[in-house]
């Protein structure tokens, strides 16, 4: 997606430790016009698939999910909540998956209320970044617990130098990334 590459080149910044920051348009301040283009692109890539719901994870994924849903006949958007500890009295009410965050070096629970994903539903997962796929696997686990089906995973920015895609494809999961970064080196972003 050339628009996304241009946004990254113009508005993205690379920190001293080679981390790409896209907070000016994606994951802090959200560029709604750009998000609409993302939604259209995901629709184009999954146009031949039945999508009953979009599943994402808080917080950046919520905006992406809502706008993307408009291009899939306004299907509902469900988001996994990140919590440190699952209260005992909630365990029977939710689907829960433990996820390791490489960014924060901690384990958290992704929870979705059982009433929001039903057996047999066709689910499209969307998220802002794909690195090691830990968050995506947490969402896939939630979908499986519900007896639903993952149609595919839509990713805005894939870190192609990390193993997320390979892990997902090894499990037969379709991955559609709008842009793939080959490497980040000396403050520069290189695309595949």
Curated annotation (Swiss-Prot):
Gene3D superfamilies: 3.40.50.2020. Pathway: Purine metabolism; XMP biosynthesis via salvage pathway; XMP from xanthine: step 1/1. GO terms for cellular component: cytoplasm. InterPro entries: PRibTrfase_dom, PRTase-like, Pur/Pyrimidine_PRTase, Xanthine_PRibTrfase. Xanthine binds at residues 20, 27, 159. Its EC number is 2.4.2.22. GO terms for molecular function: xanthine phosphoribosyltransferase activity. 5-phospho-alpha-D-ribose 1-diphosphate binds at residues 131-135. GO terms for biological process: purine ribonucleoside salvage; xanthine metabolic process; XMP salvage. It comes from the Bacteria. It is an enzyme of class 2 (transferase). Homodimer. Belongs to the purine/pyrimidine phosphoribosyltransferase family. Xpt subfamily. This is Xanthine phosphoribosyltransferase 2.
């Amino acid at each position: 997606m050339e628009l996304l590459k241009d946004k990254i080149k113009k508005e993205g910044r690379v920190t001293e430790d080679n981390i790409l920051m896209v907070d000016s348009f994606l994951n802090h301040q959200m560029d709604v016009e750009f998000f609409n283009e993302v939604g259209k692109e995901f629709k184009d890539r999954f146009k031949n698939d039945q999508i009953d719901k979009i599943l994402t994870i808080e917080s950046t994924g919520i905006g992406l999910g809502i706008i993307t849903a408009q291009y899939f006949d306004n299907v509902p958007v469900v988001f996994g909540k990140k919590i440190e500890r699952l209260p005992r009295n909630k365990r029977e009410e939710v689907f829960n998956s433990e996820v390791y965050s490489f960014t924060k070096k901690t384990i958290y629970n992704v929870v979705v209320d059982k009433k929001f994903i039903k057996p047999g539903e066709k689910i499209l997962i969307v998220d802002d970044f794909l690195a090691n796929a830990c968050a995506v696997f947490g969402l896939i686990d939630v979908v499986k617990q519900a007896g639903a089906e993952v149609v595919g995973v839509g990713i805005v920015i894939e870190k192609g130098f990390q193993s997320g895609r390979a892990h997902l494809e090894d499990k037969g999961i379709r991955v559609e990334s709008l842009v793939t970064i080959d490497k980040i080196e000396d403050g520069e972003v290189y695309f595949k």
